[in-house]
Amino acid sequence: MTKSQKRWLFVVVAVFILAALILAETTKHFLGRWIASTIYDNRAIFLSCDELPDLSDVKSVMEQHNQVIQEIKNIDPENIEITIDNSCPGKGSLIIYYPSHNDRTQIEELLGDSFFGIPWKGINR
């Protein structure tokens, strides 16, 4: 294989790898999640409006599990706030504001990936 052919092969492989990484990022958001979590200490959700539950379901689940809402707030009563994100018409998710990584860890231990099926975003402020 000549030097020119090796260079061409390298370019083709590099383009293929770059395309695969871009595709992976657009579907799984690895980099976005890493930046949100590691740099900002936030917990991001990457769902389209169509993928979010109905706003009425979000409100209903929050009412049904009010004791868990209170447990979350009791982690740091003066600094944790829980709201509904209704930026998508008719759809919703939870936003939990917390002051520290330790609080975030405790919230994640209580909730896991969702609040009884409702996606939640965590914001460190």
Predicted regions and their residues:
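Short glycine/threonine-rich beta-strand-turn micro-motifs
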Residues: 45-46, 77-103
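Ser/Thr/Pro/Gly-rich low-complexity linker/stalk segments immediately outside membranes or between
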Residues: 26-52
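Cytosolic/nucleoplasmic, non-transmembrane interface domains of endomembrane
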Residues: 51-59, 98-99
